[in-house]
Structures are given as structure tokens and as C-alpha cells.
Amino acid sequence: MKRRSVLSLTVVLLMTMFGVMPVASADDSKDTKALLEALGKSKHTLIDGVRQTAKGGAVPISAKFELEDGKLSLSVYTAEKGLSVPAEKNVLQELSGSPEGDKWAPNVEVFKDVPHVARSSEQLTLMALGKASLTNIIARVQKTQSGTVFSVTPVIRNHRAVAEVLVADDGKVKKVLQPL
């Protein structure tokens, strides 16, 4: 019994140190399974979308692949005026579109509704507190994890700003936490 407790504690400690956790039941949902299957249709990676949105001077604050009306979409939230401008004086927006074509030509939506403004304001604040860009975070995870990075979101875990990175690997989803 004591040996099991020590073994369990060791496993949890190692998972915490390396920041890798399976996502509890997320990969069991029909939506997640459909998204994982659709990822193979993309001609662009998440890092491609992040880099493209950063070219215009805006700073990417989160990015993900998702299904919009059953179709694959690449979505990147940005802070148009950068990380040093507070949310109330910034332009928080989403660039999204199909990644299935040779060029990713996203539509731009400036957030005005409370849920999107609140979520993107939090992401802006967390990215401003950190030292890493989304590009660096994705690249770091790609070096250590097999599979496809399909989501990166700044979040608060244990009173710290971290990036929650979701990786699709062999039909399963892994959650990797990275320091910002």
C-alpha cells in the first residue's frame, strides 16, 4: 500500500514537472474526435497562422483549430496595438478562416461582446506578464512532443501564468503546460 502511494505521487510529480497531462474525457467527445479527424485536411499549421497574424504588427494572444459549422477553421486572437497597450485602449480581434486552401485568408472580427472582450482581455494580460511569444511556445512543444499542436491558450494555473497547449497525437489529446 505504501509503495503504491509513493509510485502514484512520483507519477504525478513527474507529470507536473514535464507539464504533460492527458485531457480528461475531452478526446471522447464527438466534437473533439471530428476536429482531430479534420486536422489532417489543413494545409497550414497553428504556428503558420500565428506567424501570419504577427506580420501586421498585431500580437497573437491565443490560437486554435476548431470546427465552425462542421468545417475546419484556424482562429487566432490578437491584440492589434501590442502587449503594452491595456485592453480598454487596444483592439482585440479574431482572425479566422479555413486552413484547407493554399493560402490562409482569414476574416477579421473586432470583439465587442462581453464574453469575447473578457476572454481576450485576460489573454492579453497573461501574455503581457510573460516573456515568451506564442510562436516560441508552440516551437518548444513541437520539439518535445509528437503529434500536432492544435491549440495554445494563456491561462492561470496554481497562481501562475502559463500556456495550455493541446496536442493531437494518434487520435488522443495531450495537454501540455508551458511557462509564459
Go through each PLM region and give its residues.
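Long, terminal "pre-/pro-" and other extracytoplasmic accessory regions
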Residues: 2-8, 19-180
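Hydrophobic core
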Residues: 13-19
